Amino acid sequence: MASNCWESATLWAEKANKIAPTLVGGSKKHGGPDLGPVRARNAWLILGVDGRGVANEPPLLEFNGVPRLTVRMLARLQGFSDDWTFGLRKTAAYRMIGNAFPPPVAKAIGEKLKECLLYAEESNGPGERLSQEIIWR
């Protein structure tokens, strides 16, 4: 929010410092990207975010009102690094981000699976059948 020197960014950040609603990829049945149905948009509003759409740019210096998030901001919320690219079209990019499984969660699951497989191989020997008990230990 502060990248364009928005003078209210610090105050906004204090209000927005809570868990955000789930991002959803949107529907092709209606217009461009928004942050979900009415209940979700109301939850975003409590955080100080206008959920009726996605901004092209962060708020400017003297912006007055409730800001919208950009595609990059939404990607950060979902756990994507800043070097991740989504293409140029805002709606398509938002759908990819909203429908994505968050990368940090995918990484944690992958690491746990690897740990289970390595443990199973050490315990049972290579190629032996795995027990579900290994996963839930």
Task: Please report, for each region that a protein language model flagged, where it lies by residue.
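C-terminal target-recognition/interaction regions appended to catalytic cores
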Residues: 1-137
